[in-house]
Structure formats: structure tokens, C-alpha cells
């Protein structure tokens, strides 16, 4: 059975074959994760990628599976977090696909949610021209989350769709054609252990949230942090709120830590198509062009009002971001 047997009108005809291939591999990856530890150790380190990050066995397995499945498809160029350079799959192909085959792999041994993130552009004459371009030129993007449910969230530029894997039929079932980010929430996601390294506007925003009912926001907030971009995104699509991974003062974090091409751009596309916002803290993510294949960027996304508020903190005069939160009454509520 094909992975998307229902609602054939939901996927553009020119992308149907590629989506079928992505969906088929995602189903196999989900099954492999479910059997992890029985047949093989999926969490064991087996190398490093181009940026020196440790590669788990499942990182490499997933990358190989997606790359092989896309050979002979309309994908001309394939760029992966696990590959130093882009790979040519089909000289006659019309598409360029960037992928994080297994996001959140540090969670494998703790049985927390991991996922796959993908982004599709029209192919240009070269891999560089195909990928080093505006995020707004995406024609499709999405992610698969391997959790208690296996879900795919995907956008083809006309809203965001939600599919759930039916384990009985081993196929993805469309359950929502128009996912929307809830406009309001009292949740924020950030790794608070790095507070001392953040820029002042980010510290000011978090200070005001943590101050709760006694601060300028006048309400209590809850912090979340899952160390899995797909899991954070899935929660925000369900409950609203905001995710922050800012640049900071540590070596190697000056431009943030998340990669633009196959993490931030596709997630921003999915979120904005669902009515949310996505920036680098100040400017829209989809209005940017990466300088190299594995370029990093700060990333803020979630409910549109929350994202806009964080941008406004960057516009405050220096004396206000350094002031006690009681003097930032402009940001009440």
C-alpha cells in the first residue's frame, strides 16, 4: 500500500512520488526505532558529521535510507545534515531536497521523541544555487515525529496539513487539512542553563516571563525544554507558545546552533503556513539566505504575537533591556 492512500488531492501531483518515497522511509524508520535495542544498538556513536557533532547509528541509517529511496526520483540534489556536501541523485531531476534525517538523536537512548525534517526547493543548475537561496522560495517542507503517535506535518504552501500513521495499514491518514498555531499560550521553550550567555533582549524577555504575576506580564508562565526540535514544534502547533534558541557568547554559538537549511527554514515554513511566526529574534527566517550548506542561525518561532513581542524586545533602548523588569511596563500582558 502507498503511504498516502487517502485524499490524493492534498498532495500536489508533481510532489506525489517524492512524498511517497519520504513517507515509506519514515514508516520503516519508525519501525526500526520501535525495535531499537532488540536487533541493534541505535544510540551508539559511530562517527562525527561535518560540524563535529557526534553521529548515532540511527543518524547514519536514516540518512542512507532516505538517500537511497530518493534515487531515481525527481530529486536532483540531496543535502543532508549527515553529508559534508550535497549529492547529485538525478541529473534530470527538477527538485532539491534538504533533510535532517534524524533530529533529536541525543534522545534515542532515553525513549523521547525524535524526528525527520525536510525541505524542498525547485532545483537550479547547481547544488549551490539550489540550496543557498531564500527560505521563502520553498515549495514544500515538513517533519515526521516518531513518538507515541507517528505524525507528519507538511505544507505545500497552502496551509499546514497533519497526517497520522495508522500502524494497522502502515499508511499516513490525513486528519487535519488546516492546522493552526494557537494564538496564545503561557509556555515558552528555552535552555535556561545558558542564561548567562544570552543577548540582553533575550534575558529581558525571559526575566519578564519568570517574574510571573509579580512582573510586567502580570501572569505566570511555564518553561519547557525537550532538546528535540520536532517535539518542540509539535507541541507549539498543538498548544501555542514560543521556542527560542538564540545566538550567545560561547565559541561556536555566535550564530546560534540550529542549521538554517534543513532545520530552521522548513520548520519556519510549516509554522508560518499555520499562522505562526518565525524569526532569528529580529528578522523573518524565510527572508534570509544561508551562506553555506550547514550555516547556522538563531531561531525563534511559535504563536505570532509571542514572536513579535520578542522582536520588540530587540528594539528597546539599551537602558530598558538592562533595567529591572518593573520599568518595562510597555510589555504588560
From Swiss-Prot:
Binding site for Mg(2+) 2: 100, 103, 263
Pathway assigned to this chain's UniProt record: Carbohydrate biosynthesis; Calvin cycle
GO MF, one example: magnesium ion binding
Cofactor(s) named in the record: Mg(2+)
UniProt cofactor note: Binds 2 magnesium ions per subunit.
Main location: cytoplasm
Keywords from the UniProt entry: Calvin cycle, Carbohydrate metabolism, Cytoplasm, Hydrolase, Magnesium, Metal-binding
Record field: catalytic activity: beta-D-fructose 1,6-bisphosphate + H2O = beta-D-fructose 6-phosphate + phosphate
Enzyme class per UniProt: hydrolase
InterPro entries linked: FBPase_C_dom, FBPase_class-1, FBPase_N, FBPtase, Fructose_bisphosphatase_AS
Biological processes, Gene Ontology terms: fructose 1,6-bisphosphate metabolic process; fructose 6-phosphate metabolic process; fructose metabolic process; gluconeogenesis; reductive pentose-phosphate cycle; sucrose biosynthetic process
Subcellular location: Cytoplasm
Top-level taxonomic group: Bacteria
Entry EC no(s): 3.1.3.11
HAMAP family noted in UniProt: FBPase_class1
Protein name per UniProt: Fructose-1,6-bisphosphatase class 1 1
Species assigned in the record: Cereibacter sphaeroides (strain ATCC 17023 / DSM 158 / JCM 6121 / CCUG 31486 / LMG 2827 / NBRC 12203 / NCIMB 8253 / ATH 2.4.1.)
Classification of source organism: Bacteria, Pseudomonadati, Pseudomonadota, Alphaproteobacteria, Rhodobacterales
This protein's encoding gene: fbp1
Amino acid at each position: 500500500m502507498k503511504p498516502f492512500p487517502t485524499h490524493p488531492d492534498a498532495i500536489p501531483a508533481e510532489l506525489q512520488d517524492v512524498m511517497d518515497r519520504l513517507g515509506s522511509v519514515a514508516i520503516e524508520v519508525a519501525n526500526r526505532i520501535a525495535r531499537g535495542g532488540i536487533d541493534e544498538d541505535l544510540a551508539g556513536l559511530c562517527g562525527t558529521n561535518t560540524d563535529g557533532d557526534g553521529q548515532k547509528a540511527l543518524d547514519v541509517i536514516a540518512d542512507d535510507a532516505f538517500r537511497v529511496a530518493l534515487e531515481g526520483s525527481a530529486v536532483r540534489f540531496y543535502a543532508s545534515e549527515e553529508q559534508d556536501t550535497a549529492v547529485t541523485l538525478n541529473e534530470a531531476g527538477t527538485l532539491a531536497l534538504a533533510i535532517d534525517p534524524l533530529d533529536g538523536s541525543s534522545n534515542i537512548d532515553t525513549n523521547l521523541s525524535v524526528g525527520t525534517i525536510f525541505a524542498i526547493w525547485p532545483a537550479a543548475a547547481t547544488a549551490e544555487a539550489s540550496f543557498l537561496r531564500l527560505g521563502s522560495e520553498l515549495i514544500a517542507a515538513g517533519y515526521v515525529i516518531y513518538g507515541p503517535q507517528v505524525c507528519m506535518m507538511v505544507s505545500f504552501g497552502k496551509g499546514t496539513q497533519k497526517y497520522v500513521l495508522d500502524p494497522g495499514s502502515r499508511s499516513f491518514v490525513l486528519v487535519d487539512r488546516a492546522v493552526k498555531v494557537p494564538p496564545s499560550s503561557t509556555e515558552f521553550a528555552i535552555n535556561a542553563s545558558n542564561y548567562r550567555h544570552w543577548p540582553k533582549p533575550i534575558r529581558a524577555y525571559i526575566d519578564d516571563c519568570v517574574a510571573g504575576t509579580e512582573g510586567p506580564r502580570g501572569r505566570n508562565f511555564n518553561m519547557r525544554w525537550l532538546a528535540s526540535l520536532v517535539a518542540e514544534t509539535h507541541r507549539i502547533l498543538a498548544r501555542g507558545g514560543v521556542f527560542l534558541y538564540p545566538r550567545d557568547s560561547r565559541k561556536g554559538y555566535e550564530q546560534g546552533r540550529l542549521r538554517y537549511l534543513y532545520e530552521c527554514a522548513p520548520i519556519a515554513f510549516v509554522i508560518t503556513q499555520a499562522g505562526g511566526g518565525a524569526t532569528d529574534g529580529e528578522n523573518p527566517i524565510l527572508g534570509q539566505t544561508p551562506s553555506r550548506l550547514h550555516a547556522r542561525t538563531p531561531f525563534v518561532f511559535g504563536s505570532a504575537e509571542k514572536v513579535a513581542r520578542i522582536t520588540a524586545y530587540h528594539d528597546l533602548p539599551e537602558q530598558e533591556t538592562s533595567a529591572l523588569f518593573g520599568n518595562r511596563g510597555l510589555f504588560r500582558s
